[in-house]
A protein has these predicted regions:
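N-terminal carbohydrate-binding accessory modules
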Residues: 19-89
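Cellulosome-associated attachment modules in secreted, modular CAZymes
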Residues: 7-18, 540-636
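An active-site-proximal structural segment forming one wall of the substrate-binding cleft
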Residues: 70-89, 100, 106-139, 146-182, ...
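Surface-exposed, active-site-proximal loop segments in enzymatic domains
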Residues: 54-63, 96-117, 141-156, 188-200, ...
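Extracellular ligand-binding interfaces
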Residues: 411-513, 520-536
Length: 636
């Protein structure tokens, strides 16, 4: 686990950032360059609202989506930390495709109200502090498809305009602090003649330019004065920053305030590469001989030239250098990168996925963790890097709170209240240890799966356990049901009948096919103390002790927890979906691409991606792999 040693950076404070609200500093009447000139430096809330869980219904509790990739739920305190650290811009990557449904009455796609309200809440945390906020559509399965065709364009247009029509209505009166980004990194994921991460080709450029125009027309057509002057960001092919890609972006006629959106984790062999050509010293050269300073100089000179030619600003929506335990080099890189960007008039938005350097795991090209979200403090290896960034862009008032490890509250039966009408299915006073993703059967659990009951699990772990239904029909047979956020409290997770039915419906299965039910550790180890069937109309226990003991399920056999009996297959290196005999962040990225339908797997890859051996690949496998690779600090 990461711990704060003596060398941890102390709080860096150059004053207290001024607190103010957007209402007190309304921004209006600016042109595109006027807006971007005020965007000093930004921060991405990465792998949070852009995470997805395709096993959930479109109107599921948002927390289940935003925590699906292993990050804690975002909080206002996190955004406060970002603001106080000197950032005046927040980009909120947001995935929508799992939260929309087709409305036959209007022949349009609609966004779930619960998701839209959640997105608005997060936007407001930053907007109400006078920060610039970039809201986008991110990992969309209708944008990133194998091959761009007329049919895929028709689908993409219908869904994209449906989403943005509603977003523009909800935020119609927000001033120029709120910026809309039409798409994230639009690209073809399975076209052998057009590389997914290359420059693109004429067909893909035309395709993306049409979608960009559809986006602009949708926002401008909403009608509010604010949306008429809102800054809109337009990406090229995969939001690449190459001269060919950016030059191919067409600015729609009469589009008003627009900016080009680019991403550049450069120089690549310093910032992300882990192969033999990587060199994580700065300044320096790659294994191919390319000079890092020269590469950055060329990049920003080229972007400045294109910006001048097209007459629109450019925003670097994502940039970062992965943490290879090379803090001083990253600090020098940050100064070089941002000084050149500043000279070119390009504001930059730092990518932060909350993944820190892990000495046990070694080099990781996706360790872009700057703010530790469990305690809203700065990762030790990133404090000097952030200080270099702020100093370079001219921010003088900022506070970087010293790293503090998360300490989970201690479990005690004294802090758990059991209702007098709860039916005890299992109890272990000392707790049953379950390893991550370990399901174990609880006798008599299935008996209470009805509208008359819900389940309560008393547990102790950072990540709440799940309840698993095993069936012999449908698409798989093992279905994880996550806790009900509206009912659960510390140390007690609740699972309702509707939660189970929603999971079964999404997998084309039914309750009649259930053979057994299990309690399971989720994406981290867990200790299970009790499992209870709770009457649906049961009152939440008060702080007073129950006057009677909970009902114990009568049985002729002792209440036991037993191992599942499914045979396992031949041993493979679980998680190695890249088939390179190692398990790294590259495997996490590839698995995520599979889940958003931008990658296909061979049988061997499928077997290795099936982390919990349930013959299915879903978000639970992605979370398990991600935890294994880089997010196990809090469990150790």
């Amino acid at each position: 686990a990461a711990v704060c040693a003596v060398s941890c950076a102390a709080v860096v404070s150059n004053g207290n950032p001024e607190e103010f609200t957007a209402e007190a500093a309304t921004l209006t009447g600016k042109d595109a360059f006027g807006i971007t000139s005020e965007m000093t430096i930004g921060w991405n809330l990465g792998n949070s609202l852009d995470a997805s869980n395709t096993s959930l219904s479109y109107d599921a509790a948002p927390k289940k989506s935003v925590t699906a990739w292993g990050n804690p739920e975002p909080t206002k305190e996190l955004i406060d930390t970002v603001h106080n650290a000197g950032f005046n811009t927040v980009r909120i990557p947001t995935t929508w495709f799992t939260h929309i449904y087709f409305d036959e009455a209007t022949n349009t796609y609609k966004v779930s109200d619960v998701w839209m309200n959640y997105v608005k809440k997060v936007v407001d945390w930053a907007y109400d502090q006078g920060m610039f906020v970039i809201l986008n559509v991110h990992h969309e399965d209708f944008i990133n498809v194998a091959v761009f065709t007329d049919d895929t364009y028709a689908t993409a247009k219908q869904k994209l305009t449906g989403i943005w029509s509603q977003v523009s209505e909800v935020f119609a009166d927000y001033d120029q602090h709120l910026i809309f980004e039409g798409m994230n990194e639009p690209r073809e994921t399975g076209n052998s003649s057009n590389s997914e991460w290359g420059d693109g080709d004429q067909n893909s450029w035309n395709y993306i330019n049409k979608l960009n125009k559809d986006f602009v027309d949708t926002i401008r057509g909403q009608g509010s004065a604010e949306n008429k002057e809102r800054l809109l960001m337009l990406p090229g092919y995969h939001a690449g920053a190459s001269e060919k890609t950016v030059s191919a972006i067409e600015i729609p006629e009469n589009s008003g305030n627009v900016a080009i959106s680019t991403h550049a984790y450069t120089p690549y062999f310093f910032a992300m590469a882990t192969d033999e050509y990587a060199n994580h010293s700065f300044p320096g050269k790659s294994g191919y001989g390319g000079d890092y300073e020269t590469e950055l100089e060329t990049q920003f000179n080229t972007l400045k030239s294109i910006s001048d030619k097209k007459g629109v600003p450019i925003i670097m929506g994502e940039f970062s250098a992965s943490d290879f335990n090379n803090t001083a080099d990253r600090a020098r890189w940050a100064q070089s990168y941002l000084s050149k960007a500043k000279a070119a008039g390009i504001p930059c938005v730092l990518w932060d996925n909350n993944v820190a350097y892990n000495a046990e795991k070694g080099d990781d090209g996706e360790a872009h963790g700057y703010i530790y979200r469990m305690t809203n403090t700065i990762y030790p290896n990133s404090s000097d890097v952030l200080k270099s960034m702020m100093d370079t862009v001219g921010v003088t008032d900022y506070t970087l709170p010293e790293y503090k490890e998360y300490e989970a509250p201690a479990f005690s039966w004294d802090n758990v209240k059991i209702g007098s009408d709860w039916i005890e299915l299992y109890k272990n006073q000392s707790g049953l240890e379950l390893e991550a993703w370990k399901p174990e059967k609880v006798d008599n659990m299935k008996k209470y799966l009805s509208e008359d009951y819900m389940y309560a699990v008393v547990y102790d772990s950072t990540v709440p356990p799940a309840i698993v239904m095993q069936t012999s029909t449908g698409t798989g047979g093992w279905y994880y049901t996550l806790l009900n956020d509206d009912k659960s409290v510390d140390f007690t997770a609740f699972y309702t009948y509707d939660d189970f039915m929603s999971v079964l419906k999404n997998n084309n299965d039914s309750a009649s096919a259930i053979s057994d039910m299990y309690v399971s550790a989720h994406s981290g180890d867990s200790k299970i103390y009790g499992v209870y069937a709770v009457p649906a109309n049961s009152q939440q226990p008060t702080t007073e002790e129950p006057t009677t003991e909970p009902v114990t399920e009568p049985t002729t056999e002792p209440t036991t927890v037993t191992e599942p009996t499914d045979p396992t297959g031949e041993a493979v290196l679980k998680g190695d979906v890249t088939l390179d005999n190692t398990v790294t962040i590259a495997d996490v990225v590839l698995l995520q691409k599979y889940l958003i339908k931008s990658e296909a797997f061979t049988d061997e890859q499928f077997d290795r991606a099936d982390m919990n051996d349930d013959s299915r690949i879903n978000i639970f496998d992605a979370v398990a792999l991600r935890r294994y690779v880089a997010l196990d600090e809090s469990a150790e």
